Amino acid sequence: MSEHTTTPQGREIAVRVEHFVRDVVVPFERDPRWTSHGPSPEMVDELRSLARAAGAMTPHIPAGRDHLSHRDTAIILRAAGLSPLGPVAVNVAAPDEGNMFLLGKVASLEQKARFLAPLLAGRIRSAFLITEPAEDNGAGSDPSMLRTAAEPDGDHWVINGRKCFSTGLLGAKVGIVMAKTAGGATMFLVDLPNPAIRVERVPETIDSTLPGGHPTSRIENLRVPSSAVLGEVGEGFKYAQVRLSPARLTHCMRWLGACIRAQEIASEYAVKRQAFGKLLIDHEGVGFKLAENRIAIQQCTLMIDWCAGVLDSGASGTTESSMAKVAVSEALFRVADNCVQVMGGAGVTRDTIVEQVFREVRAFRIYAGPTEVHLW
């Protein structure tokens, strides 16, 4: 991304975020409060307090301003991603980043004041309840299989169903629930926690960056007023695309930053570690892997910039974001794998964040739609 496609404001914010992540967030990577289900609530609060003090909170949506361009957002989220904890710290992590974008586009003024404002301030977290358990033959990559249903009852709706992989549900204060209604699907805004939404389990997954984990929950007779409808009744699938196309790309932005950091760590290791009488970097097998990574990182950067330009033009970017998600997720997995391989035994330990980036990027090939679904 060059000065021809980004603004001075975007570049200045990206530099500020990068300094904050490298200087302040990186030392937290060894904090024991970072669990298998993400950083603890206390750790999130501490990181966000530091982000506010540094002027790095929700940096892609400056106070009193609209969302920056997708191209400016790309360099900012890439900077945030230089630590796996960076996006959480500066409030650009999934699912909150995508939910804020959706609410900014679709929510009523009252809903924005009640739900969006505290999200933008980083005071609360959110969850997006759309995916359903496979054992129920529910909606996964195919949203048309949606089983959770909402029935009208006077000026209220009653919702029943099960959800899974609702990232961040534990500890979230607002949820966006997708449910079947007559004539289509509808999104509902729900205050959390709610006794009608019961967490059944929080599975252990290979990723561990996002607070609140990826719970499975049962929704039983959840009663919400008609004012809880997000947008229009029956337009849920349309709104999902409003959210998902940009969200696919912001995943790419964040994990590009993480893989840049992994490449830095692996390169530093290769120029210090010796084997067979010379530095690792002087062995072609190692040098080639790091060179291939440099090429892949540049290709990902250009792919993201191209797709961001499509979104900035006002196009939906459905096809383009699928293309970018496939290309970037597959390339970054190879980058992370090469970094582990270059570092050998050190690469599979938790002495650095390289092994974590590898695990997170592996999950990225599934999250926001598996590669095979986007290709199809």
Feature locations, PLM:
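Alpha-helical interface subdomain recognition
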Residues: M1-P84, A93, V106-Q111, P118, ...
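Short Ser/Thr-interspersed hydrophobic loop/turn segments at strand-loop and sheet-helix junctions
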Residues: G55, I76-G81, A179-A182, V190-P195, ...
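N-terminal glycine-rich flavin-associated loop
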Residues: V90-E110, E135-D136, G140-D142
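Flexible, small-/acidic-enriched active-site or ligand-binding loops
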Residues: S141, M145, P193-P225
